[in-house]
Regions:
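Beta-strand elements within well-structured catalytic alpha/beta cores of enzymes
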Residues: 51-63, 82-83, 92, 106-108, ...
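Histidine-centered active-site microenvironments of extracellular/periplasmic hydrolases
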Residues: 75, 182-191, 269-274, 279, ...
């Protein structure tokens, strides 16, 4: 049940599931309706200063139960909790169950399986995953271990491209994880006008390097500004906050901006943390540092006069690594139990969301794609159909959610094919009623074979929409680069090579069978279509 009501004027179009939008859509902001057929130049001239800025903050591997408003220690998340009290909190907000698929869905408004990002994110070195995918650890023709190139397809339209076309300044500050090697896969080729942070799936918070799951001393530097490696001292969580402050300070009220701020916090390895460890565990201290960063960003928006006209969103990319931090939900990251895919989400938009309200309508992270375009007065038409639905009615006028289905996984990945339709979720051979049993304690498949049959048929229908994989992914060349970004690696600075060589000298020459240098989530039960 939706528990709040807003007074926005006008009527919003609703997106048809798996269909592209009609040629026009009504975008609402500041109480006004805008014609989306306006050209980019006309939009920029007519609407500059009136359209909402959009700031999207994404944490990494935070558990459902870690924010204070969800039962966590309020000492660790005062700024997140303050944002929750100032904004709208969603209780049925969903993501994919791991990093890269979630980011791909957010960027494109499409399920990750549609561009194989659910598979590509797993093809680079986790031995148990590779076995399921019929792959081996990547080696070049000379037998030197390397990585397969995996990235978001270049024919995908990103939210950054859509908002840039609509006249927004666009920036990514933090973790990209949608392609780290070929130039055409990097953020500034995908619609972002400013880039800062790291390209790949994780980074040491101080060294800015990442060891990969390969049987070699494979350590790569991964810290960049506008596609150039940069040398910076400090803790990445703090650095991302500082860069965001600088970017906000450079904005003006004549041009709206979209800031995508995907932190690597609180993803492992969490070993060294700059403060709070005298009182808290390293993980808790890292969470509190992230909360500090979110507070700095909110304060910067206020300081520079943007807060009242900014749609500020906080959420997380997937469930936490342990069930303890996902309570009361079952499951973890890398599973499609609720604990792996239900994420905390807060939305604050002064004048459009009411402080301290809660909405239990179903929403998927891909829905931000269409929602943002509507708010921006952008163009919905595109070649590839989207799965994203326009949520402005639910978020800003108290309407029921237009979403009643989420496809979390189809066949072909290492996780269990899973679909939620209405109250029911089919997860392989398991069936749960999420409305009456949100903690997934009781499998009711045997009692409801008709529902199982119907959901399996729907899942198979969607599964058939996965495109052919195509050619086997290319390998990185050279096999052991110093820095991500093929052009950045052509002539890396000496300080960078020395730093990488120093760390490589401490790495084992090979990993023991089945082992990897990064912690992995527990395995999910096996299921199939």
């Amino acid at each position: 049940m939706n528990l709040y009501l807003f007074s926005w004027e006008g009527k919003m179009n609703r997106r048809q599931f798996l269909k592209s939008t009609a040629t026009t859509a009504t975008a609402l902001f500041a109480g006004c309706a805008v014609n989306n057929n306006s050209t980019t130049n006309r939009i920029g001239k007519k609407l500059a200063g009136s359209r909402a800025n959009i700031v999207f903050i994404l944490s990494d591997d935070m558990g459902w139960a870690e924010p204070g408003f969800n039962g966590g220690n309020p000492e660790l998340t005062p700024n997140i909790d303050r944002l929750a009290s100032d904004g709208l909190r969603l209780t049925q907000f969903y993501t994919h169950s791991v990093c890269s698929p979630t980011r791909a869905a957010f960027l494109t408004g499409r399920y990750a399986f549609r561009n194989w990002m659910d598979w590509r994110s797993e093809d680079f070195g986790k031995p148990s995953y590779l076995e399921k995918l019929g792959l081996t650890l990547a080696h070049n023709d000379e037998g030197v271990p390397t990585r397969r190139i995996h990235a978001l397809d270049t024919n995908e339209r990103t939210i950054a491209e859509a908002l840039k076309e609509a006249g927004y300044f666009t920036a990514i500050i933090g973790k990209w994880h949608a392609g780290e090697w070929l130039k055409e896969h990097l953020p500034m080729q995908r619609g972002f006008m400013h880039q800062y942070g790291h390209y790949a799936w994780g980074v040491d918070y101080y060294d800015k390097t990442i060891p990969h799951n390969a049987p070699a001393r494979f350590v790569v530097y991964d810290w960049h500004r506008n596609e150039q490696p940069i040398r910076e001292e400090g803790y990445t969580t703090d650095l991302i906050a500082a860069e965001t402050e600088r970017v906000i300070a450079r904005q003006n009220k004549e041009k709206p901006f979209f800031l995508y701020i995907p932190f690597n916090a609180v993803h492992g390895p969490v070993v060294r943390v700059p403060r709070y460890t005298d009182k808290y565990t390293p993980r808790e201290a890292a969470l509190k540092c992230f909360d500090d960063a979110l507070g700095r960003i909110a304060a910067a928006l206020e300081k520079h006069g943007f807060a009242d006209n900014t749609l500020l969103i906080f959420t997380n990319d997937n469930g936490g690594l342990t069930e303890e931090i996902n309570k009361p939900y079952r499951g973890t990251k890398n599973t499609t139990f609720e604990g792996g895919v239900r994420a905390p989400c807060i939305i604050r938009w002064p004048g459009h969301t009411q402080p301290g309200t809660v909405n239990d309508g179903m929403m998927f992270i891909a829905d931000f794609f269409t929602t943002f375009i509507s708010i921006a007065g952008g163009r919905h038409e595109q070649e590839l159909p989207v799965d994203s639905l326009d949520m402005t009615g639910m978020l800003c006028r108290g309407e029921s959610s237009p979403r009643d289905e989420i496809v979390f996984e189809v066949s072909g990945s290492v996780r269990i094919p899973t679909i939620r339709k209405g109250d029911y979720k089919l997860m392989g051979k398991l069936l749960y009623n999420i409305k009456t049993d949100p903690y997934e304690t009781t499998d009711i498949a045997a009692r409801h074979p008709d529902i199982v049959k119907r959901l399996r048929a729907r899942l198979m229908e969607v599964d058939a929409e996965r495109p052919p994989l195509g050619d086997k992914p290319l390998l990185m060349e050279p096999p052991l680069p110093y820095v991500y970004g093929i052009e950045e690696n052509e002539n890396p600075p000496e300080w960078l090579k020395e730093a990488v060589d120093r760390i490589r000298a401490t790495q084992p020459k090979e990993w023991a069978p089945g082992e990897t240098p990064w912690p992995q989530a527990p395995k999910a039960p096996v299921g199939s279509l």
